[in-house]
C-alpha cells in the first residue's frame, strides 16, 4: 500500500502499486489528461511506470520545464518513426534534447534535401493525429541487443555495448518503431502538437571526423502554438542578424578552409577591432593596469608546472624545435606569473594588475567552430591581479564597477551575475575558501546587485563570478569573469615579502571583461545588426556629391574630416543621388552628408542619419561638434 506524498504535503494511500497517470486521475480528469510524466523522490519517470513504495511525487505537465524537455525528446523519436516509414536503409544514431529544441543524427546513403525535410514534417503531423500510445518496454541488455540486431540498427548496438550488464534498458515503442532512451517520454502523441523541423546539417558519429558521416535533422517544439510562433520569429530575426552573413555583406571578416577557426580581418572589421582595443586600453590605464606582452610559443615544461599540460594537452597546438617541444599558448596566466616573478615583490607593491591583449590558440573540434563565436585563435582582454587575501574584496568590487561601465558603453543594460563556490575536489584550506567566498559575496551585496548562487560550480583552485549579457533577442552571452586562484601562484612559485619579512604566495585573480575580442565583436554585429554606433562604425560619415561639379568639394571636405581624426569616405560616382543614398544606407554608415550646389555655396553639407532623419545643414565646425557628441555617447542607451 504505497503512501504518495504530493507537493502540497497532502497524502494519498493506494491499495496496490500505482502509476503517475493513476495518481493524476485520482486528483482530477483534467490533470490526468495533461500529465506527461512524474518525479518520484526527485527522479523523473514515465507516467505509466508502477510506483510500489511510499514516495514523494510531483506530476509533470507541459507547463513544467521538465515537461517541455520531455515533449522535445519525444519529438526526436517521432523523427525516427517518420523517416523509417519513408526511407529504406536508414540507421538511427542519437537524438538528444538541446536548448529550445532537439535533433536526430541519422545514417543514410541518400542525401536529405529541404524537400525531404518537408516530407518528414508532414509524416510526423500525420503520425501525431493518430494519438497512439507510446509504450515503454524495460528489457535486459541481452533483449535490447536482440531487438536492435533484428532491426539492423548498428549505432544503437554500439551504444548498448557501453551499457553495464546489470539493470534494465528502456525501449520506447512508437507503433512499429522502437527506439532506446533513458526517458521519460510522453504517454501518448496527443501531447505532441506544436513543432517545426528547422534545418539539416552534417555531423559525425561521436563527433569524430574519422567516424561515419551522419545527417542531422534539427527541430523545435513548444507547449503552445504562440510559443512556437514567437520562437520562429526570434529565429528569423537571429538569422537576419547572423554575424557570419553580415560579416560577409559588410566586408568585416572571412574564414577560409586553409585556416579553420582563424579570422581574416578585412579593413572594416579591423577598424572595429582597433577601436575596441583602444577603448579597453584607455579603461585599463585609467584603472592602474600595467599592459604587458608575452610569448606565443612556450616550452612545455612551463605548462607541466602550471598543470595545463596534464589537463589541456589535447586542446593545445604544439611545435618542436631543437629537440624541445613548445605549446602555442592556450591561455596567458602562466606567462603573467613569469613577469610577476621578475624581481623581489613587497606587500607594499600589491596589488599588481598585469593586463595583456593576449593572442591564444586552442585546438577546438572542427564541428564546434562557429564564425567569430567559436574560434581556434582569439585575443583575450586578459588581466591578472596579484594581491593579498585581504585585498580580494576591494579588487573584486572595483572590477564589478568596471564590468558594468564597459557593458553599458555598448548598450547592454541587463547583466546576469552568477557566483560559483567550492567544488568537492579543491585545493587550498577551508579558511581561505571561506574568506574568498565571503569577499566575493560582500563585493556583490555591497552594490545591491541581484545574483545567482551556483554551489559547487567553482574551479578546483577558487571561487568565481561570471557576468553574462542579455542581447536584443533575449539571448544570454557569458563574457566577463573574475576568478580567485590559490593554486597557480604556489605551483609557479610566485611570492612576495610580507610585513613580517616572510615570503608568502599572493592570491591571483584571473579576470576578463569582453572574454575574447572575436566573440564580443560577433555579439556586437548581431546586437546592432551591423548598424554600429558612430564611435565603432568602420566609416562614421560618407560624403555624396550630387553632380560632378561637387566632387572637388566632397574630396576637400573628406580630407579635412579625416585629418581631424574622424573616419570619412566619399562617393563621387556618376550616379543619381538617390542611388548613392540607398547604397550608403545599405552600407550602414551612420551619417550621410550630401553636397550639391546650394551646400557648396555656403561651405556646408546637408546631413541625414542612417534611419533617414534629416538633421539639417552643417558647416564643418558644427559637424565636428555633432560627431563629437555622438561619439562621446558611444552605444549607451541612456
From Swiss-Prot:
Task: Tell me the cofactor note.
Answer: Binds 1 zinc ion per subunit.
EC number(s) reported in the record? 6.1.1.3
Biological-process GO terms, alphabetical: threonyl-tRNA aminoacylation
Q: Name one GO cellular component term.
A: cytosol
Keywords from UniProt, A to Z, are: Aminoacyl-tRNA synthetase, ATP-binding, Cytoplasm, Ligase, Metal-binding, Nucleotide-binding, Protein biosynthesis, RNA-binding, tRNA-binding, Zinc
The UniProt annotation places Zn(2+) binding at 333, 384, 510
Q: Which reaction does it catalyse?
A: tRNA(Thr) + L-threonine + ATP = L-threonyl-tRNA(Thr) + AMP + diphosphate + H(+)
Instruction: Please name one Pfam family that this protein belongs to.
Output: HGTP_anticodon
Q: What Gene Ontology terms describe what this protein does at the molecular function level?
A: ATP binding; metal ion binding; threonine-tRNA ligase activity; tRNA binding
Annotated NCBIfam families: thrS (TIGR00418)
The entry's function note states:
Catalyzes the attachment of threonine to tRNA(Thr) in a two-step reaction: L-threonine is first activated by ATP to form Thr-AMP and then transferred to the acceptor end of tRNA(Thr). Also edits incorrectly charged L-seryl-tRNA(Thr).
- What this protein is called in its record is Threonine--tRNA ligase
Native species:
Prochlorococcus marinus (strain MIT 9312)
Amino acid at each position: 500500500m504505497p503512501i504518495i506524498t504530493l507537493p502540497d504535503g497532502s497524502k494519498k494511500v493506494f491499495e496496490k502499486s500505482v502509476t503517475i497517470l493513476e495518481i493524476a486521475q485520482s486528483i482530477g480528469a483534467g490533470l490526468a489528461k495533461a500529465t506527461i510524466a512524474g518525479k518520484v523522490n526527485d527522479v523523473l519517470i514515465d507516467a505509466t511506470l508502477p510506483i510500489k513504495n511510499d514516495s514523494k511525487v510531483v506530476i509533470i505537465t507541459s507547463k513544467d520545464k521538465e515537461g517541455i524537455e520531455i515533449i522535445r525528446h519525444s519529438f526526436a523519436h517521432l523523427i525516427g518513426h517518420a523517416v523509417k516509414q519513408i526511407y529504406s536503409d536508414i540507421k538511427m544514431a542519437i537524438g538528444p534534447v538541446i536548448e529550445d529544441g532537439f535533433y536526430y543524427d541519422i545514417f543514410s546513403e541518400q542525401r536529405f534535401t529541404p524537400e525531404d525535410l518537408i516530407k518528414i514534417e508532414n509524416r510526423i503531423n500525420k503520425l501525431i493525429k493518430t494519438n497512439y500510445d507510446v509504450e515503454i518496454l524495460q528489457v535486459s541488455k541481452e533483449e535490447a541487443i536482440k531487438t536492435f540486431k533484428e532491426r539492423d540498427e548498428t549505432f544503437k548496438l554500439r551504444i548498448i555495448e557501453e551499457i553495464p550488464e546489470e539493470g534494465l534498458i528502456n525501449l520506447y515503442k512508437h507503433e512499429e518503431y522502437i527506439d532506446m532512451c533513458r526517458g521519460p517520454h510522453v504517454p501518448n502523441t496527443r501531447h505532441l502538437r506544436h513543432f517545426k523541423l528547422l534545418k539539416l546539417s552534417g555531423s559525425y558519429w561521436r563527433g569524430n571526423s574519422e567516424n561515419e558521416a551522419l545527417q542531422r535533422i534539427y527541430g523545435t517544439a513548444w507547449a503552445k502554438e504562440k510559443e512556437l510562433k514567437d520562437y520562429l520569429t526570434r529565429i528569423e530575426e537571429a538569422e537576419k542578424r547572423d554575424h557570419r552573413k553580415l560579416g560577409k555583406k559588410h566586408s568585416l571578416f572571412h574564414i577560409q578552409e586553409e585556416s579553420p577557426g582563424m579570422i581574416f580581418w578585412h579593413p572594416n572589421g579591423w577598424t572595429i577591432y582597433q577601436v575596441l582595443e583602444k577603448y579597453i586600453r584607455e579603461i585599463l590605464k585609467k584603472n592602474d593596469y600595467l599592459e604587458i606582452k608575452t610569448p606565443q610559443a612556450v616550452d612545455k615544461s612551463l605548462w607541466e608546472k602550471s598543470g595545463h599540460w596534464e589537463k589541456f594537452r589535447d586542446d593545445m597546438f604544439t611545435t618542436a624545435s631543437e629537440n624541445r617541444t613548445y605549446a602555442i599558448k592556450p591561455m596567458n596566466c602562466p606567462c603573467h606569473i613569469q613577469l610577476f616573478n621578475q624581481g623581489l615583490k613587497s606587500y607594499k607593491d600589491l596589488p599588481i594588475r598585469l593586463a595583456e591583449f593576449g593572442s591564444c590558440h586552442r585546438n577546438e573540434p572542427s564541428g564546434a567552430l562557429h564564425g567569430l563565436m567559436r574560434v581556434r585563435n582569439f585575443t583575450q582582454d586578459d588581466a591578472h591581479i596579484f594581491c593579498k587575501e585581504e585585498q580580494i574584496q576591494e579588487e573584486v568590487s572595483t572590477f564589478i564597477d568596471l564590468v558594468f561601465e564597459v557593458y553599458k558603453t555598448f548598450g547592454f543594460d541587463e547583466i546576469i551575475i552568477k557566483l560559483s563556490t567550492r567544488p568537492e575536489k579543491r585545493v587550498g584550506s577551508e579558511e581561505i575558501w571561506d574568506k574568498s567566498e565571503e569577499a566575493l559575496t560582500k563585493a556583490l551585496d555591497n552594490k545591491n546587485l541581484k545574483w545567482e548562487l551556483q554551489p559547487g560550480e567553482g574551479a578546483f583552485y577558487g571561487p568565481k563570478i561570471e557576468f553574462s549579457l542579455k542581447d536584443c533577442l533575449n539571448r544570454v552571452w557569458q563574457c566577463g569573469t573574475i576568478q580567485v586562484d590559490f593554486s597557480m601562484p604556489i605551483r609557479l612559485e610566485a611570492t612576495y615579502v610580507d610585513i613580517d619579512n616572510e615570503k608568502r604566495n599572493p592570491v591571483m585573480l584571473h579576470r576578463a571583461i569582453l572574454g575574447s575580442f572575436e566573440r564580443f565583436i560577433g555579439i556586437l554585429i548581431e546586437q546592432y545588426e551591423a548598424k554600429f554606433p558612430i564611435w565603432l562604425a568602420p566609416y562614421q560619415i560618407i560624403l555624396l556629391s550630387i553632380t560632378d561639379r561637387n566632387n572637388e568639394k566632397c574630396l576637400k571636405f573628406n580630407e579635412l574630416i579625416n585629418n581631424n581624426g574622424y573616419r570619412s569616405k566619399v562617393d563621387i560616382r556618376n550616379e543619381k543621388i538617390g542611388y548613392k543614398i540607398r547604397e550608403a544606407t545599405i552600407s550602414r554608415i551612420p551619417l550621410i552628408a550630401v553636397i550639391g550646389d546650394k551646400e557648396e555655396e555656403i561651405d556646408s553639407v546637408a546631413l541625414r542619419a542612417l534611419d533617414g532623419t534629416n538633421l539639417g545643414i552643417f558647416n564643418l565646425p558644427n559637424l565636428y561638434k555633432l560627431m563629437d557628441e555622438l561619439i562621446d555617447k558611444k552605444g549607451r542607451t541612456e
